[in-house]
């Protein structure tokens, strides 16, 4: 059985590491009016009647697939998506970003391709890239690493933290474009080690190559989610389904649970990974499994929310009173608890 930990990423150890880091930082929160602390998708700082939302994220080991294919023109889209999708989760409109590119040695051609993707992603998200940092770090970095930090703005009385999520609320899932930018270490282990495929090989059950599927850009949810937020729909919570899978819903409110029994069929890439030996619970713990973003709304507003979000959005379950538990019906028919 292939696991994420065996692929080099230990989720439990990462959580302990983050806790160890942030436990030393809480005393600094006294220096500004912080509304949300560590652990939410984005941090909020009050500036009068408006709050600034901030988030930082990176592309991760998807960069290694780009290196294998010598194709860097889409990873910039992923970088933008990972940041702006998190900012959306507090009800804020993403506004601007700065990027960070660390390289083993400068390569103008590769940098130009990355810049092309960043510009495309910024257009999709309607954000400005206002600066950044490029660092040459031989001995520390092998090839390159790409990340960004973004800000957004939201009126204080329009902030969405998830505290209004209540049992009986409906969870709406917005489809992903594919694997997005999480779980790539496990996916690479499966395709390139277990199945012994190359990036150019056709992915089983698909007309696309393995590399094309792994590099498919992360979907940017700014347009549909901002339209939802600015409507009359009573939005109680928003969650970006990234690392940790549907466990990300537990970041909204600790004393409620979720029952997800109407999930859409995951894309073929996830089926191939599962059939190659990854346990189905591990699949839902690591990957988005076809749903890249969730909106939790009042039951009376479901129809209006769906009309706004379009045909790539589906009711996938409801909020329960089982504190901090996500129970879902997997694509195999099994019931899984996260």
UniProtKB/Swiss-Prot annotation:
Enzyme class: ligase
Catalysed reactions listed for this entry: 2-formamido-N(1)-(5-O-phospho-beta-D-ribosyl)acetamidine + ATP = 5-amino-1-(5-phospho-beta-D-ribosyl)imidazole + ADP + phosphate + H(+)
Coiled coil: none
Pfam families cross-referenced by the UniProt entry: AIRS, AIRS_C
Listed EC numbers: 6.3.3.1
Any Gene Ontology biological process: adenine biosynthetic process
GO cellular component, one term: cytosol
Pathways per UniProt: Purine metabolism; IMP biosynthesis via de novo pathway; 5-amino-1-(5-phospho-D-ribosyl)imidazole from N(2)-formyl-N(1)-(5-phospho-D-ribosyl)glycinamide: step 2/2
GO molecular function: ATP binding; phosphoribosylamine-glycine ligase activity; phosphoribosylformylglycinamidine cyclo-ligase activity
Membrane-crossing segments per the record: none
InterPro entries: PurM-like_C_dom, PurM-like_C_sf, PurM-like_N, PurM-like_N_sf, PurM_cligase
Keywords: ATP-binding, Cytoplasm, Ligase, Nucleotide-binding, Purine biosynthesis
UniProt superkingdom: Archaea
Subcellular location: Cytoplasm
Primary residence: cytoplasm
Family per similarity comment: Belongs to the AIR synthase family.
PANTHER family cross-referenced by the UniProt entry: TRIFUNCTIONAL PURINE BIOSYNTHETIC PROTEIN ADENOSINE-3, TRIFUNCTIONAL PURINE BIOSYNTHETIC PROTEIN ADENOSINE-3-RELATED
HAMAP family linked to this entry: AIRS
Protein name as catalogued: Phosphoribosylformylglycinamidine cyclo-ligase
């Amino acid at each position: 059985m292939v696991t994420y930990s065996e692929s080099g990423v230990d989720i439990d150890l990462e959580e302990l590491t983050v806790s160890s880091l942030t436990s030393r930082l809480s005393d600094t929160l006294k220096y500004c009016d912080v509304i949300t602390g560590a652990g939410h998708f984005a941090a909020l700082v009050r500036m009068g009647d408006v709050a600034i939302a901030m988030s930082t994220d990176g592309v991760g080991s998807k960069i290694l697939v780009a290196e294998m294919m010598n194709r860097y023109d889409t990873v910039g889209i992923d970088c933008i998506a990972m940041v702006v999708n998190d900012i959306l989760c507090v009800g804020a409109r993403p506004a601007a970003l700065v990027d960070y590119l660390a390289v083993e040695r400068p390569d103008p051609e590769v940098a130009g391709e990355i810049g092309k993707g960043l510009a495309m992603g910024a257009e999709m998200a309607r954000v400005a890239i206002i600066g950044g940092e490029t660092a040459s770090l031989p001995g520390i970095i092998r090839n390159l690493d790409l990340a960004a930090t973004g800000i957004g703005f939201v009126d204080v009385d329009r902030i969405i933290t998830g505290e209004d999520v209540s049992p009986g609320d409906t969870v709406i899932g917005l489809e992903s474009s594919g694997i997005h930018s999480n779980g790539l270490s496990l996916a690479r282990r499966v395709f390139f080690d277990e199945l012994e495929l190359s990036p150019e090989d056709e992915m089983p059950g698909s007309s696309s190559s393995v590399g094309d599927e792994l590099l498919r850009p992360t979907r940017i949810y700014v347009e549909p989610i901002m339209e939802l937020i600015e409507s009359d729909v009573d939005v109680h919570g928003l969650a970006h389904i990234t690392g940790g899978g549907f466990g990300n819903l537990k970041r909204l409110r600790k004393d409620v649970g979720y029952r997800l029994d109407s999930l859409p069929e995951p894309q073929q890439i996830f089926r191939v990974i599962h059939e190659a030996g990854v346990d189905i619970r591990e699949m839902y713990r690591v990957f988005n499994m076809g749903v890249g973003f969730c909106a939790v709304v009042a039951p009376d507003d479901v129809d209006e929310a769906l009309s706004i979000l379009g045909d790539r959005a589906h009711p996938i379950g409801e909020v329960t009173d089982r504190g901090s538990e996500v129970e879902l019906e997997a694509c195999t028919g099994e019931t899984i608890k996260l």
